[in-house]
Amino acid sequence: FISAIASMLGKFL
């Protein structure tokens, strides 16, 4: 779960 969120944040950043 956290990994998915981190990936999404990384995409935005």
Curated annotation (Swiss-Prot):
Keywords: Amphibian defense peptide, Antibiotic, Antimicrobial, Secreted. Expressed by the skin glands. The keyword Secreted applies. GO terms for cellular component: extracellular region. GO terms for biological process: defense response to bacterium. The keyword Secreted applies. It is found in: Secreted. Belongs to the frog skin active peptide (FSAP) family. Temporin subfamily. Antibacterial activity against Gram-positive bacterium S.aureus (MIC=100 uM). Shows no detectable hemolytic activity towards human erythrocytes. This is Ranatuerin-6. It comes from Aquarana catesbeiana (American bullfrog). The lineage of its organism: Eukaryota, Metazoa, Chordata, Craniata, Vertebrata.
